């Protein structure tokens, strides 16, 4: 019955309404999501048929709760909400009359109620929570489609459960028409659902819209079915079919299925197959399970359909546990299936991404490997070109074939979006370029005839933009290829010389810049390296550091183009040049690379070393450097600009191949004023070696010509034979030396000698900055934790011709003196617990702290004529030292006792170091030369520690600062003792006091003579010594010495030492009075030592630390070569006191032995036992600058200094035309120099200053004989330059020395002095907290040089020692330790060895004479024994105190 008729519909008619199964299907489908009641179609049918108000009201209330998103709608209160939604949606939107205006819902006909229920289901899908609740459901599961169709056009529908409906075709329409109509209608409806059939363009719809479209499709489908039903019922127009229940039991399903078995039509056979295979088995199971369920009673149903869904759930759990379990299981299975599907999809996606990443990584790795291979080939090619050799075929044509990715990789959507955005930006930049107009549109043959015949793949910007808009570029490579094709086409059609081609090149550069900007670069994409000039960035740095370098710097840049930058010269088919050739080919370079250097500046055969340019064009004795070819090709072909902060490579001395003599490479030397008439600058080898197109600021060496700015006093260069420091990486290995991280210490010349692993700021570095060197192509960076960038120290590789024969690497550790008697030191080039591989590097120093002050002002750019003493550091040093120790106030610091050291270092004596001058008329005693030369060195007991001795001798010198970093305790070093400049009035007073103190000094000398057990050594000298020698030279010429010729020794720590001696003298004991220059302060270049100071005494304290290599104490007078604790920060610059000259002299290396069996290895060193450098300024220089001997050569024993060695060992000795000559012709000269020598001792022996102070030359001038001379040899000299800081309390220390006994020392015996630069004796460690100070804080009286040595009045030969010590072939004692460190003994004079440039003084001699100790016999080519010792006056044995047992130093016992 139809609803319009108003009667209750029969059950058959109710089953013919398609809305009923639609409502049941909807509730079943969205039951969980919308919290709808659970029922079957049969139950809904029964409720509608029986007019079950409660069931229908509960269903309506649940649907309205979802529509209004309110939980307070109940079956009792739903009427108002129902009226509201029907009024709004039914009447206003659909335009139908509102049936609820006339009656309530219960009074409406059944048909209308069913329609309202179905419409409420549609409204529920429009609620706001649908999108979130249905996001896990598939759209296909929401759609109901017929199972099939028979030949009559009837459709078979299955919603859910066990029922199947049949829709008969519309009456009056043929089966074909009905079928076609339904098919087209179905296709139209389905096409509205995305993802079903027709693909829709544009953005995918949102979920909510998707659900709405799904529901609307259902509505349309249902409406069509309803219209069919109504048409068949006669209530609607024609063209609609009728619905009826076909089957719901198992028998009915089987009958319907069997009815299609014998059918022959395709549709019916498909329908039969579907029903028989898919539906029939499942439907039978479902019917069987339904039959097993307990019959529900009416009260159960009433409870189930209560308005509150939660209460219904609880009742169901209590009363129907079986149904609840089944329901939960079903839901669980559905959820598991959905989760499993999601997991599978996610896993597959992750696997794809993983494979893509792996492929990309493999491509990148391969690209990087290929790039490294090509780079190595280029470097090898450049190296061969530099050698002038022919290139093998594989190196002739090096292609820059960057790896291209094979195939198109599908990127993620977001990656594609980013790439497309970047491509658009790049394209916009290219289009906006001024030269892009010829490429904007396709080429027209009207103005480009035959273009498309020549160009097969035309391309233009508009075509690329179209492809980009169409999404045809899957990756940027395609985009780049099209752009390159466009540029290639232009070049191909127009030729290289066309204006269009030039515009194409400009546009291509613009394109590359845009690509670099918008596409982040990937490693391995290309191996092209581009070099740009960077003048502006360097300008500020160069001006700040005070250097004047005239050229620009080549640095590496990723930028392929630079509109404002010069492009590097392009060779080899467009590749960027290797660094060496690139620099050489640049036309505006001021200096040429190794390939294009002129003969006097260029390298030999393209090696990385350049010949120094001499103004006089004097031939430099450079060996053929191809003999020094590195072990691996490309060792010197370091990339130009690989480190932008250091554009000149580390200077390396490659070892000669076995069997070839190692010839000394030439190095810049400095001419004295008077020969060259100006201080020219020499370009040192490391600066010319790998500098490429840039002449860097010459930090260590300068051209020996006026600089470009007209400066006649540029920084001083290295002396001949001196090899500047290497700055980058480990040194080159000999050909037979295996490459490993464990480089034995004997093979490496370490760049620094300091104990606490900190950089010393040396003079010849730039101020406060580091100058890192570049590593070569095959060179490894530093092995240890230290930085690869070091300051320019003066530690350099030595010349092999003056060094001991090397020993094989496998015998290094077998040497008895590998470390002191085999006992490693905690500071031996490594912090404790570091492996041997870490010995090579100093610790990282981020920035030079005030603790390690920068180089002196002269090296930072002070021009000639400016005194180093005027530098801010020296002024601050004067102020600080004046505050630390005012004259007359003894300074007795209380320092913690250093812990007892193992091995040969137990006897760290306290640092009371007072130099004693012999109160003997040495100037007129010719015999004093022999006495001073050789003394017995008493035996020393190294096992006699006095750890409990806390009372330090009064004069605690700063040389303890050398040991400070070696000792475990962190006590800060003492402040430098007071230094003051003596006024002329004071000097006169001091002169008078000097005579009165002479006798006391003599007694003290006798007492201390045997205490000093450090062997004599004079391998270095201090500014104080030089100043003293200069004063002595004046005295020697004037002859106005005091009657006894005694000048009290000046102790740098004199204010501290004053308490030791009762004289109460507060004035420096270096008075000139009427004769000498008034006591010049002993800290600067003018710091003078008394003329009577025994040079052997000075040498004595210098060289006891033979076996122990102590980094940092090699250069006793280097600028701040010694680590300083914070208490000495203000005094840092004092260590290398500034003098008037423009630059400190560079120093000669200890040469290699040219004909040694192992030419590639560095020979080990022998600490000097002879005197340090006592200087004698002759009246006129004897040699030209290039003929100067080095300041000192390989260290030797005390008696080795006088021996002439074979000529081939002299790296830069005087020419053969100059006969060997001694420094002194009169021994009284030497006697007057004892004060200087003692002062030299003060540089290194902080602990024995008081001991040496007591040393007195017998007044009668009688030679005490060999025994006393040998004993005198053991007398230690003070080792701290700090002792030059104050001469006030010299008498006090001299007198106190009489009472000083063995117990006064911390460990029982006087500590040895510093050796030639890096070794200790048995009692090597003085107490902590003392610092080596060299240099004077006072302005020198002469502004000729930094440190004007005033050593000896006349260059008269001295007598050789009577008892030379037996040495090995190169003059070294056999027990010497193996310290093949790069700058071992190199920087002894880096603070004080200044060139004499005083004008018109007449007291200057040649360089060798100025810096030559007494007794030196100059051999034309001999450099190993350049500084023989002179005999020193010694006290008789009966004058020596009985309580001190004579001992021999460790290296001579």
UniProtKB/Swiss-Prot annotation:
Keywords: Bromodomain, Chromatin regulator, Methylation, Nucleus, Phosphoprotein. It is found in: Nucleus. GO terms for molecular function: ATP-dependent chromatin remodeler activity. One of its GO terms (cellular component) is nucleus. Disulfide bonds: none annotated. Residues 170-237, 536-667, 767-796, 827-868, 884-1020, 1046-1072, 1131-1308, 1331-1368, 1396-1453 are annotated as: Disordered. Residues 210-222, 985-998, 1265-1289 have a biased composition (Basic and acidic residues). Residues 1173-1187, 1202-1211 have a biased composition (Low complexity). Residues 655-664, 887-905, 1352-1364 have a biased composition (Pro residues). The modification Phosphoserine is found at residues 402, 551, 983, 1280. Residues 197-209 have a biased composition (Basic residues). The keyword Phosphoprotein applies. Residues 223-234, 637-649, 999-1020, 1228-1250, 1291-1304, 1331-1346 have a biased composition (Polar residues). SUPFAM superfamilies: Bromodomain (SSF47370). The modification Phosphothreonine is found at residue 526. One of its GO terms (biological process) is neural tube closure. InterPro entries: Bromodomain, Bromodomain-like_sf, Bromodomain_CS, CECR2. The modification Asymmetric dimethylarginine is found at residues 1166, 1172. Regulatory subunit of the ATP-dependent CERF-1 and CERF-5 ISWI chromatin remodeling complexes, which form ordered nucleosome arrays on chromatin and facilitate access to DNA during DNA-templated processes such as DNA replication, transcription, and repair. The complexes do not have the ability to slide mononucleosomes to the center of a DNA template. The CERF-1 ISWI chromatin remodeling complex has a lower ATP hydrolysis rate than the CERF-5 ISWI chromatin remodeling complex. Component of the CERF-1 ISWI chromatin remodeling complex (also called the CECR2-containing remodeling factor (CERF) complex) at least composed of CECR2 and SMARCA1. Component of the CERF-5 ISWI chromatin remodeling complex at least composed of CECR2 and SMARCA5/SNF2H. LUZP1 is detected as part of the CERF-1 and CERF-5 complexes in embryonic stem (ES) cells where it is involved in complex stabilization but is not detected in the complexes in the testis. Interacts with CCAR2; CCAR2 may form part of the CERF-1 and/or CEF-5 ISWI chromatin remodeling complexes in ES cells. The Bromo domain recognizes and binds acetylated histones. Also recognizes and binds histones that are butyrylated. This is Chromatin remodeling regulator CECR2. The gene is Cecr2.
């Amino acid at each position: 019955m139809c609803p319009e008729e108003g009667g209750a519909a029969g059950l058959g008619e109710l089953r013919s309404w398609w809305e009923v199964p639609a409502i049941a299907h909807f509730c079943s489908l969205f039951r969980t999501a919308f919290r709808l009641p659970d029922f079957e179609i049969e139950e809904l049918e029964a409720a509608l048929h029986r007019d079950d108000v409660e069931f229908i009201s509960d269903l309506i209330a649940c649907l309205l709760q979802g529509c209004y998103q309110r939980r307070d709608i109940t079956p009792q209160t739903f009427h108002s909400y129902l009226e509201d939604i029907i009024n709004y949606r039914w009447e206003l939107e659909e335009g139908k009359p509102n049936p609820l205006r006339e009656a309530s819902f219960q009074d409406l006909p059944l048909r209308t109620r069913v329609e309202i229920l179905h419409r409420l289901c549609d409204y529920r899908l429009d609620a706001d929570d649908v999108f979130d609740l249905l996001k896990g459901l598939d759209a296909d599961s929401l759609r109901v489609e017929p199972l099939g169709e028979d030949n009559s056009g009837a459709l078979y529908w299955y919603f859910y459960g066990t029922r199947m409906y049949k829709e008969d075709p519309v009456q009056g329409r043929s089966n074909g028409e009905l079928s076609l109509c339904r098919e087209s209608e179905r296709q139209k409806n389905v096409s509205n659902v995305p993802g079903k059939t027709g693909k829709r363009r544009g953005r995918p719809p949102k979920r909510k819209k998707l659900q709405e479209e799904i529901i609307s499709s259902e509505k349309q489908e249902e409406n069509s079915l309803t219209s069919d039903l109504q048409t068949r019922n006669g209530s609607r127009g024609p063209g609609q079919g009728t619905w009826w229940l076909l089957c719901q039991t198992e028998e009915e399903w089987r009958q319907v299925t069997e009815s299609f078995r014998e059918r022959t039509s395709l549709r019916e056979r498909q329908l039969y197959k579907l029903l028989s295979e898919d539906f029939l088995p499942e439907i039978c199971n479902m019917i069987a399970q339904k039959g097993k369920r307990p019959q529900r009673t009416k009260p159960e149903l009433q409870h189930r359909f209560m308005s509150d869904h939660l209460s219904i759930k609880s009742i169901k759990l209590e009363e129907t546990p079986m149904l609840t379990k089944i329901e939960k299981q079903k839901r669980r299975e559905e959820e598991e299936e959905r989760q499993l599907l999601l997991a599978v999809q996610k896993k597959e996606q992750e696997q794809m991404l993983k494979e893509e990443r792996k492929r990309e990584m493999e491509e990148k790795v391969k690209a990087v490997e290929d790039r490294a291979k090509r780079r190595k080939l280029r470097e090898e090619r450049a190296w061969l070109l530099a050698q002038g050799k022919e290139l093998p075929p594989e190196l002739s044509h090096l292609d820059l074939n960057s790896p291209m990715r094979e195939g198109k990789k599908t990127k993620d959507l977001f990656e594609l979006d980013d790439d497309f955005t970047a491509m658009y930006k790049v394209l916009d930049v290219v289009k906006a370029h001024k030269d892009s107009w010829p490429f904007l549109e396709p080429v027209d043959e009207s103005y480009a005839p035959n273009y498309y015949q020549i160009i097969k793949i035309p391309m233009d910007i508009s075509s690329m933009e179209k492809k980009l808009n169409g999404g045809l570029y899957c990756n940027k490579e395609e985009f780049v290829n099209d752009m390159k094709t466009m540029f290639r086409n232009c070049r191909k059609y127009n030729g290289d010389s066309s204006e269009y081609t030039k515009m194409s090149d400009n546009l291509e550069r613009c394109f590359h810049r845009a690509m670099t900007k918008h596409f982040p670069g990937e490693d391995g994409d290309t191996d092209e390296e581009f070099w740009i000039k960077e003048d502006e960035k360097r300008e500020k740095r160069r001006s700040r550091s005070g250097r004047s370098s005239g050229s620009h710097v080549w640095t590496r840049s990723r930028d392929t183009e630079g509109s404002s930058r010069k492009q590097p010269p392009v060779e080899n088919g467009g590749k960027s040049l290797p660094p060496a050739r690139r620099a050489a080919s640049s036309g505006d370079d001021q200096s040429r690379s190794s390939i294009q250097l002129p003969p006097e500046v260029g390298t030999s055969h393209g090696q990385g070393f350049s010949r120094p340019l001499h103004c006089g064009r004097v031939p430099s004795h450079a060996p053929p450097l191809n003999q020094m070819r590195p072990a691996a090709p490309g060792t010197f072909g370091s990339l130009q600009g690989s480190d932008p902060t250091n554009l000149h490579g580390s200077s390396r001395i490659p070892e000669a191949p076995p069997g070839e003599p190692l010839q000394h490479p030439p190095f810049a030397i400095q001419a004295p004023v008077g020969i060259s008439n100006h201080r020219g600058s020499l370009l040192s080898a490391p600066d010319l070696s790998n500098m490429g197109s840039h002449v860097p600021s010459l930090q260590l060496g300068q051209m020996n010509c006026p600089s470009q700015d007209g400066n006649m006093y540029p920084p001083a260069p290295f002396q001949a034979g001196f090899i500047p420091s290497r700055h980058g990486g480990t040194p080159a290995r000999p050909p037979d030396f295996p490459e490993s991280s464990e480089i034995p210490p004997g093979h490496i010349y370490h760049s620094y000698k300091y104990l606490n692993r900190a950089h010393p700021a040396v003079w010849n570095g730039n101020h406060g900055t580091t100058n890192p060197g570049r590593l070569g192509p095959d060179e490894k960076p530093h092995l240890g934790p230290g930085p690869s960038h070091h300051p320019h120290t003066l530690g350099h590789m030595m010349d092999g011709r003056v060094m001991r024969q090397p020993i094989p690497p496998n015998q290094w550790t077998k040497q008895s003196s590998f470390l002191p008697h085999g006992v490693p030191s905690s500071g031996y080039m490594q912090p404790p617990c570091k492996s041997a591989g870490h010995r090579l590097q100093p610790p990282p120093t981020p920035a030079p702290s005030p603790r390690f002050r920068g180089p002196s002002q002269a090296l930072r750019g002070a021009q000639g004529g400016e005194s180093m003493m005027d530098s801010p550091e020296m002024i601050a040093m004067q102020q600080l030292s004046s505050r630390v120790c005012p004259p007359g106030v003894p300074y007795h610091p209380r320092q913690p006792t250093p812990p007892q050291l193992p091995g040969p270092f137990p006897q760290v004596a306290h640092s009371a170091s007072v130099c004693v001058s012999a109160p003997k008329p040495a100037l007129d005693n010719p015999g004093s030369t022999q006495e001073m030369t050789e003394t017995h060195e008493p035996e020393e007991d190294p096992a006699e520690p006095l750890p409990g001795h806390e009372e330090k001798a009064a004069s605690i010198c700063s040389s303890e600062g050398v040991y400070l970093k070696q000792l475990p305790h962190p006590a800060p070093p003492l402040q430098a003792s007071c230094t003051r400049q003596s006024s002329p009035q004071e000097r006169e007073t001091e002169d008078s006091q000097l005579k009165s103190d002479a006798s006391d000094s003599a007694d003290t000398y006798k007492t201390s003579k045997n205490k000093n057990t450090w062997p004599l050594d004079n391998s270095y000298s201090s500014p104080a010594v030089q100043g003293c020698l200069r004063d002595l030279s004046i005295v020697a010429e004037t002859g106005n010495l005091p009657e006894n010729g005694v000048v009290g020794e000046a102790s740098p720590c004199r204010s501290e030492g004053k308490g030791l001696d009762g004289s109460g003298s507060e004035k420096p004991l270096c008075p000139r009075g009427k004769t000498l220059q008034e006591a010049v302060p002993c800290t600067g270049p003018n710091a003078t030592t008394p003329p009577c100071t025994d040079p052997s005494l000075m040498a004595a304290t210098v060289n006891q630390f033979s076996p122990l290599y102590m980094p940092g104490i090699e250069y006793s007078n280097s600028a701040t070569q010694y680590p300083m604790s914070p208490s000495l920060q203000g005094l840092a610059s004092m260590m290398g006191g500034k003098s008037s000259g423009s630059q400190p002299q560079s120093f000669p290396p200890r040469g290699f032995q040219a004909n040694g069996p192992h030419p590639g290895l560095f020979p080990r060193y022998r600490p000097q036992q002879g005197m340090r450098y006592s200087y004698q300024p002759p009246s006129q220089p004897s040699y030209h600058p290039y003929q100067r001997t080095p300041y000192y050569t390989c260290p030797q024993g005390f008696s080795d200094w006088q021996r002439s060695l074979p000529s081939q060992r002299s790296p830069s000795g005087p020419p053969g035309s100059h006969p060997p000559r001694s420094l002194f012709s009169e021994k009284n000269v030497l006697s007057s120099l004892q004060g200087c020598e003692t002062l030299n001792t003060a540089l290194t022996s902080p602990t024995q200053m008081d001991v040496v102070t007591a040393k007195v030359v017998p007044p009668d001038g009688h030679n005490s004989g060999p025994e006393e001379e040998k004993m005198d040899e053991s007398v230690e000299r003070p080792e701290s330059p700090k002792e030059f800081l104050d001469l006030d309390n010299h008498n006090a220390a001299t007198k106190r020395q009489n009472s000083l006994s063995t117990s006064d020392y911390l460990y029982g015996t006087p500590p040895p002095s510093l050796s030639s630069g890096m070794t200790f004796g048995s009692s090597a460690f003085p107490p902590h907290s003392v610092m080596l100070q060299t240099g004077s804080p006072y302005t020198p009286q002469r502004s000729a040089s930094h440190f004007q040595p005033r050593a000896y009045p006349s260059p008269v030969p001295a007598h050789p020692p009577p008892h030379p010590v037996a040495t090995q072939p190169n003059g070294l004692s056999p027990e010497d330790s193996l310290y093949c460190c790069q700058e071992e003994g190199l920087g002894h004079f880096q603070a004080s060895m200044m060139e004499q440039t005083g004008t018109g003084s007449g007291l200057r001699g040649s360089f060798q004479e100025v810096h030559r100790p007494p007794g030196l016999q100059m051999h034309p080519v001999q450099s190993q024994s350049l500084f023989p010792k002179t005999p020193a006056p010694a006290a008789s044995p009966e004058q020596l105190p009985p309580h001190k047992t004579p001992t021999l130093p460790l290296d001579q016992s």
